[in-house]
């Protein structure tokens, strides 16, 4: 459920913000337009947000700036510490992950996440969306930004291109984690009662907006 990558998150806590700012050449294309992508997710979110994979709190900060109530979930203690420092106690950040998390104390209208849903296998994504469908009322939404691929061929080409450019850390990451394709995501959203749309943000990342339909 993504916790197999916890050691990596904890090692990345100190340098994550530098990576998203483009200092890591291998991940520069992944984080291209990072601030704009986070702003897009924050703008699409409703007023009461359950955020998964808070990390160092970059999306959380944008949500708070827009007057949202945020309940954050983050499995890494060092990341939670970084987020708490950045947010100065303005949001509740709790231990948990996409599948095991404390239930918010009030109804939520949005579930948000950036650069994190790929930590779940497709089967775990299915399980997670089943849970979220129960949490959200009709009209509620899921707004995720994450690396995904148009199809399997595009995924294969991305790995080959990373290798050709000498970006072996990026290629290893693409092969190690559970990146998926748009057709798989669309099918999973539909299965659990969501109408989903996808908007490409850079060579890797798509914003996914999935609205819960009337049951």
Swiss-Prot record:
PANTHER family: TRANS-ACONITATE 2-METHYLTRANSFERASE-RELATED. CDD domains: AdoMet_MTases. InterPro entries: Methyltransf_25, SAM-dependent_MTases_sf, Uncharacterised_MeTfrase_YrrT. The keyword Oxidoreductase does not apply. It comes from Geobacillus kaustophilus (strain HTA426). Could be a S-adenosyl-L-methionine-dependent methyltransferase. The keyword Zinc does not apply. It holds the Pfam family Methyltransf_25. S-adenosyl-L-methionine binds at residues 53, 74, 97. Belongs to the methyltransferase superfamily. YrrT family. GO terms for biological process: methylation. Keywords: Methyltransferase, S-adenosyl-L-methionine, Transferase. It comes from the Bacteria. Its EC number is 2.1.1.-. GO terms for molecular function: S-adenosylmethionine-dependent methyltransferase activity. This is Uncharacterized methyltransferase GK2543.
